Structure formats: C-alpha cells, structure tokens
C-alpha cells in the first residue's frame, strides 16, 4: 500500500531531463497504463464503429427508400393496368357476341402479369436489403478482425525479446533436423 501511495506522490515530481529509467513497480504503473489504453480504445473505437454502423444504416435506408419508390411505380403501373382492365371490360360488353372467352383470357393474363411484376419488385427489394445487410456485416467483421490482428501483433511485438526469439529459432531448427533424420 505504501508503494501505491508513493507512486502517486511521485507523479508530482518529474525526474530531470537527463535521467531515464524503467519503473519496475508493477502496482504503480500497470493500472494507470491499462486505464489510459482502455480509455483511448473505448473513446476512439466507439466512434469508428458508430460511424461505420451509421453509414451502413443510411445506405440501407436509402435502398429501402429506392425500393419504396419502385413499389410506388409498381402501384402506379397497377392502377394503369386496372384502368386498362376497366377498358377491356367495357370492350368485353361490346364484343360479348364475338367471343367472351378470349377477352376473359386477356383479362386474366393482364392481372397475372401485373401480380408477377409486383412480386418481382418485392423480391428485388428484399434481395437488395439482404445484400446490403450482409455487406455491412462483412465490412464490420473485417474491420473488427483487422483491429484484433493489429492488437495481437502489437502484443506479440511487445512481448518478443532477443532471447525468446533465439530460443524459438533454435527449437524450430531442432525440429527440422529431427524431421530430416526421420525422412532419411
């Protein structure tokens, strides 16, 4: 406990410009460093992730708006088709003597083609939404993976020293020598 209070007291007294050294007191340095690093990560990481998600949300909303506009166009086409249907029905009354079944077939074909068009537009809207969502998810995953990889590389680089590096190389050379003896 005395070391902790001494470290906080010593924060007010900076060493002179000529001295440099390592503080080996773990209790005095790590909580401060960790809190600073975590604070920086949370502060900057939250903003980046929030901006990325906001951008994706705007793109998805724009896609939905475009799909709604297409839907509005389809509804307009449906109204035109209904108008044509009414016209066809009027003509059907006039030409009933000439053949009612042919007009009925045309009416059904017109209705079916209109419903197919609406179905296609709805499917296109749903596919577009799913595609945009998947693309947003993939980009978020990629950014998170890149950040995690950078953090892991930073941790590895900070933990590696020359002695550990030489031991790892020696162990790998030994394993390769053993594998060569086995294959010979």
UniProtKB/Swiss-Prot annotation:
Keyword Membrane on entry: yes
Keyword set, alphabetical order: ATP synthesis, ATP-binding, CF(0), Chloroplast, Hydrogen ion transport, Ion transport, Membrane, Nucleotide-binding, Plastid, Thylakoid, Transmembrane, Transmembrane helix, Transport
GO MF terms held by the record: ATP binding; proton-transporting ATP synthase activity, rotational mechanism
Localization in the cell: Plastid, Chloroplast thylakoid membrane
TM ranges: 27-49
Main location class: plastid
Any one Gene Ontology cellular component term annotated for this protein: proton-transporting ATP synthase complex
Family annotation (Pfam families): ATP-synt_B (PF00430)
HAMAP family, per the entry: ATP_synth_b_bprime
Function summary: F(1)F(0) ATP synthase produces ATP from ADP in the presence of a proton or sodium gradient. F-type ATPases consist of two structural domains, F(1) containing the extramembraneous catalytic core and F(0) containing the membrane proton channel, linked together by a central stalk and a peripheral stalk. During catalysis, ATP synthesis in the catalytic domain of F(1) is coupled via a rotary mechanism of the central stalk subunits to proton translocation. Component of the F(0) channel, it forms part of the peripheral stalk, linking F(1) to F(0).
Family listed: Belongs to the ATPase B chain family.
Other comments on record: In plastids the F-type ATPase is also known as CF(1)CF(0).
Listed name of the protein: ATP synthase subunit b, chloroplastic
UniProt gene name: atpF
